[in-house]
């Protein structure tokens, strides 16, 4: 993706340095980064911005029942081990539930293609000889940047699932075990991934199916600010090329998606409003080594042994930038106990109103029937009720 006009974390740091009349050392010794991070969260998580809506697709998997299983409660290679003969445990088995003799058991871990373990509180309690079984899946991990979503839609039938509470889902899970076409969905904490949510459907699909939904994603995190190791050494790139070669650089895999700016042989590049505006900037597409990366798109000109910076892009809609800048000034005023906190807040509040207005891209009325569910399970109209 080309990056001709992106605002970066570096720009926000530099802005607060100017705002506070600080020097380079102050970038380390003042709460500049804390103010930026706080303002970023406060503004961007305080509203369901249209800019952050994205589509996500979940492949729903059919139950699996090939072969037979033997359950070894204790003393085997693993405690509570379920061994499969005549088949292969699906790669998704860690999220599965196993039915044996009409009873549902929770999977703890997939150990190999033929071995998995059941949880301590959900198992037969004693050894079970070779027997038929079925394993199914109703729990699917949400994207790592998930904040909230609309109800999902099944692709094959274009039917929308109905939201129910986790407690209602639990009752259905116990009472109705036949795989069919999912009708309901809810949200739970992901059982295998910390700080992640999972969508749970009922019933499990009987045949493989795809499900889509629109969700509210989180903005990209801010980690790299163009200072320290993100400006060490020099870089070289040919005209109309994407391959960047560094000298004494420390490129990282985590720099993928960040913005690299090219300066001159004598000057480290700044933002447009700085003393040494960058010559070109592009996002980083791939990482090869500490001295080799490739850009997402080609640069126009050649650069030989020039200074550079790498910084994370500010993942906001352009109409929100002014509010973010006023927000970091306000947070900085709080953290440094400045006397003009109230004035900074007034400017921030006014800028937020303008940002909200810029977020209304569509003139059509919105109704309270348009509901967004986030990870705690609340609902919220996406705009003014159309009464």
Predicted segments, located by residue:
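Glycine-enriched, solvent-exposed interface loops adjoining structured elements
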Residues: 1-81, 85-238, 256-387
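Short glycine/serine/proline-enriched coil/turn segments at secondary-structure junctions
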Residues: 251-252
């Amino acid at each position: 993706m080309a990056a001709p006009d992106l605002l970066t974390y570096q720009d926000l740091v530099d802005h607060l340095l100017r705002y506070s009349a600080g020097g380079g050392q102050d970038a380390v010794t003042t709460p500049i980064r804390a103010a930026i991070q706080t303002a970023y969260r406060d503004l961007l998580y305080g509203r369901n911005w249209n800019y952050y809506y994205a589509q996500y697709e979940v492949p729903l998997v059919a139950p699996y029942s090939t072969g037979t299983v033997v359950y070894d409660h204790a003393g085997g290679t693993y405690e509570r081990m379920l061994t499969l003969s005549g088949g292969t445990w699906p790669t998704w088995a860690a999220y599965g539930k196993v039915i044996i003799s009409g009873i549902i058991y929770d999977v703890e871990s997939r150990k190999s293609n033929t071995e998995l373990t059941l949880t301590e509180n959900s198992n037969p309690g004693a050894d079970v000889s070779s027997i038929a079984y079925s394993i199914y899946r109703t729990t699917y991990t949400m994207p790592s940047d998930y904040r909230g979503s609309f109800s999902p839609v099944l692709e094959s039938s274009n039917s929308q699932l109905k939201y129910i509470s986790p407690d209602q889902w639990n009752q259905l899970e116990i009472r109705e075990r036949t795989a069919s076409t999912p009708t309901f969905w809810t949200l739970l904490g992901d059982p295998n991934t910390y700080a992640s949510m999972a969508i749970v459907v009922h019933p499990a699909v009987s045949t493989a199916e795809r499900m889509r939904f629109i969700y509210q994603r989180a903005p990209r995190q801010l980690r790299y600010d163009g200072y320290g190791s993100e400006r060490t050494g020099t870089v070289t790139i040919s005209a109309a090329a994407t391959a960047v070669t560094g000298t004494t650089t420390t490129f990282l895999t985590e720099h993928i998606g960040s913005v690299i700016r090219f300066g001159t042989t004598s000057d480290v590049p700044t933002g447009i409003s700085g003393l040494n505006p960058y010559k070109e900037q592009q996002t980083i597409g791939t990482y090869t080594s500490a001295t080799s990366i490739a850009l997402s798109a080609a640069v126009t000109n050649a650069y030989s042994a020039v200074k550079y910076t790498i910084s994370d892009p500010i993942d906001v809609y352009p109409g929100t930038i002014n509010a973010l800048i006023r927000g970091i000034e306000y947070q900085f005023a709080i953290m440094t106990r400045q006397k003009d906190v109230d004035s900074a807040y007034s400017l921030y509040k006014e800028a937020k109103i303008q940002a909200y207005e810029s977020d209304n891209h569509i003139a059509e009325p919105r109704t309270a029937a348009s509901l967004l569910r986030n990870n705690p399970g609340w609902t919220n109209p996406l705009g003014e009720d159309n009464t």
